[in-house]
């Protein structure tokens, strides 16, 4: 069976394996029998266990045919809006871009570009609504 970028598929978690110099991975099996590896470290908070079934999006298939999967996030859904608390504001860089830093539900720091046409940066501790554009390695990519 051919996997298609952007589509979700169910995979059974067969076991965890340790690859030298690459760390722990989940060995997954699709119903077609195809086996794939998923790095474990980015998804420590996902409660993925051996013999469980997880739903993953085919994030990318590179030119050599390697498939990159992104498990469905336990909290965030792409293109939905969520509240985040501002933890840090940045100074303008040489291109006059500003950023804010928020934390996701697993306390990952996420930087968000603040448009120059918006009013002033929100204050630290302020709650703001941000859209989850996509998820990469368990961390949301956020947008205003």
Language-model region placement:
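Single-stranded RNA-binding regions, centering on S1/OB-family and related RNA-binding modules
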Residues: 1-144
């Amino acid at each position: 069976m051919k996997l298609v970028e952007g589509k979700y598929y169910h995979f059974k978690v067969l076991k965890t394996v340790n690859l030298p110099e690459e760390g722990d991975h989940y060995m997954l099996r699709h119903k077609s029998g195809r086996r794939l590896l998923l790095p474990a470290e980015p998804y420590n908070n996902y409660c993925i266990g051996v013999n469980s079934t997880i739903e993953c999006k085919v994030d990318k298939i590179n030119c050599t045919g390697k498939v990159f999967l992104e498990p469905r996030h336990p909290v965030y859904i792409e293109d939905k809006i969520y509240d985040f608390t501002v933890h840090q504001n940045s100074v303008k860089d040489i291109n006059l871009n500003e950023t804010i830093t928020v934390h996701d539900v697993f306390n990952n720091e996420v930087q968000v570009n603040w448009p120059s046409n918006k009013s002033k940066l929100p204050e630290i501790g302020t709650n703001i609504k941000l859209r989850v554009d996509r998820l990469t390695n368990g961390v949301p990519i956020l947008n205003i």
